[in-house]
Amino acid sequence: MSLVPDFSRRGFIRLAVAAPLLGQIAAKNAFATAATALGKNPRQNVYTRLGVRTVINCRGTWTYLSGSLEFPEVTAAQRQASEYFVNMFELQHAASRRLAELTGSEAGMVTSGAAGAMASATAACMAGGDPKNVWQLPDTTGLKDEVIMMGGRSAFDNAIRLTGAKLVLAETPEELASAINNSTAMIYTTHLGNALVSENIVAKKFNIPILLDDAAGIPPIDNLKLYAKMGLDLYTFSGGKGLRGPQCSGLLLGRKDLIEAAMKNTSPWEGSVCRAMKVGKEEIVGLLTAVETWLKTDLNALNREWNARVQRIEKLVQTVPGVETDISIPADGNRYPTLHISWDEKKWGYTVKDCVQQLRVGDPVIEVAGADNPSIVPAVHEGNPKRSSQEEPERRNLELVSSTIQPNEVLIVGQRIRELLNAARKAAPGA
C-alpha cells in the first residue's frame, strides 16, 4: 500500500503535467526583465501613451471591453475603403445585394451594432418607407406602435423605445397570440430553438413581423443562413462580437421590403429617427469582409485552437489543491470553449468576486467572467416585473472565454490565477 495520500499523488501528477508550462513562464519572466533593463517596454502602444491600460480579455466579446479583435482582412478592407469617396445610398444597396448572396436572406444592411438594428427594424415596422411617417417618428400618432417583447424587459429595449414604440410583455406563444391587436407593429424575441419556432408560427398566423435578436449568435456562421431558411422576417447579429468585424457595426437581415424601409429610417437620410446611428463606408465594407472571411473559416479548427488555450490555463490552475475545473461550449450564445474554475469559497474565505477584482486591478489587467456586470445601468431590471421571480444566483465560478484570449497571454493568465488561488488557499483559516 502506498504511504503517499491519494490527494498528494494527484497533486504531484498535476504538477508534472504543468511543469513544461511553468518552465516557459520562468523563461518569459527572464526575457521581460532583460527587456526592461534595456529600456524597452514591449507593452507600450497607442493606448498606454494615453494613460489607458490595455486588458487581457478572458471575458469574451463584451462591448465595455471593446468587443473582439478584427480579422486582419477586415482591417485591410477598411483601410482601402477609407481612401475613396462613395455615394452611401449606392453602397447600402450594393451591400444589401451582396449580403443576400452570402446569407440566403432577401436583403440585408449594416447597422450601428445589433442595438442599431433593433431601432431601425422597429422604425421600419411602424413607419414603413413613407416619408411622412419617417419624419413623424418618434411621434407614433396614427401608426401601429406596439412591440411585443418575448420574455420581458431587456437592458437593450431602449433601442426599441427611442423610436416611439410602446412595449407589451409576453412569455409564451399563447400570451403572444393574446397580446396581438390592431396596434401591434412587431414582435421582438431573443429565444432560440423550439420557442423561436413556436413564436414564428404565431407571427405568421397574424401577419406580424418578428425580429430575432441573436447578437452573440455567431459562431456558428451557419446561423446567417439558418434563420433565412426558417422564414424569419428580420434577424440581427452584432458585427463586433463573434463576427470579428468593426466593433460599432451590426447586421440586419430579412425581408426585402422591411430592409428597404429600415434603410429609409436611418442614416444617411436626414430627418430619420435613426439618423444618429450612422455607419460609415468603412464599417459597411469591413463587416461585409468579416462575413466573407467567416464563410471561408474552418470552425472546427478554430475550436481546437481555442480549446488548447484554455486547456493550458487549466493545467496551471489544477496544480492548486482544492481547485476544480471543466471546459464546455455554451449552447445559447457565445459558443466558444469556456473554462470554469471553482473552489470552496466558504472554506477558503475567498470568493469568486474577490478573485475577479484582484485580477481586474492587477498588472496586467485581466478580465474574467465572474459575479458582476460593470457595464449595466444599476437601475435596470430585466424580465417581467409582473411575475414574481427570484434574483439570479451569484456566479460560483470563474469563467474564461477562449476566443478573446490571445496566444501570448495564456501563460500570463494561468500563472496569475494560480498565484491568487494558491495565496488564498494558504491564507485560509486552518490552512
Q: Where are the regions that the model predicts?
A:
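Conserved N-terminal alpha-helix of the aminotransferase class I/II PLP-enzyme fold
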Residues: 71-113, 124
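Conserved PLP-enzyme active-site core in the AAT-like
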Residues: 11-16, 20, 38-56, 60-68, ...
